[in-house]
Amino acid sequence: HDPHPVYQAFMAQDYSENFSRDEVRQTVIPTYMGLIQQLDNHIGRVLAKLDEKGLRENTLVVLTSDHGDYLGDHWLGEKDLHHDPSIRIPLIISDPSDAADSTRGSSSDALVEAIDLVPTLTEYAGAKVCSERMEGRSLTPLMQGGLPSGSWRDYIISEIDYSDRGPRTLLNLHPYDCRARVIRTRQWKYVLHERFRPQLYNLLDDPNEF
């Protein structure tokens, strides 16, 4: 069957066509990995300086990103759509408090969102979390072993806006119609597009979202 119209419009962009070429991927992906190595080295410098200044034991360190990158996966470039290479981001938190000893060095498969960071940092700063204004949830219970990851959240939400992107012209859309909303559970991902048919992925049977 034909690709989804929005997906097809993004695949038709110059950057997607370029990233889909094997010779480009063979050049860009190692370069991208090298940049990650460079970032890792600089993070090491920051942590070493915290140790040198005696600040490591009372400093909360958070490493995250605002988006991923396709790098040619799904025949796409950049970061624009709903697949996991774009919306699934790293989140590493070093909590020096004694309360986090039980989870130190571990990983969690809990469904968390970027908006969870604001209430988390607010709570760590000793300020009141205004739940009526903050949509996220403090991650402290997960980080300090007070809550199993499976009971944390049933779904997460992501939103897409491509009103300033090339596909808007190809699809002849009003800017207000260049939006999609994504709901993801552990098993399912549902993408609701303005003006176009929705998409549904069973992530257990189709983890690569094809």
Predicted regions mapped to residue ranges:
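Short, ordered coil/turn segments that flank beta-strands lining enzyme active or ligand-binding pockets
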Residues: 41, 203-205
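Active-site-proximal cap/lid insertion segments
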Residues: 1-111, 124-133
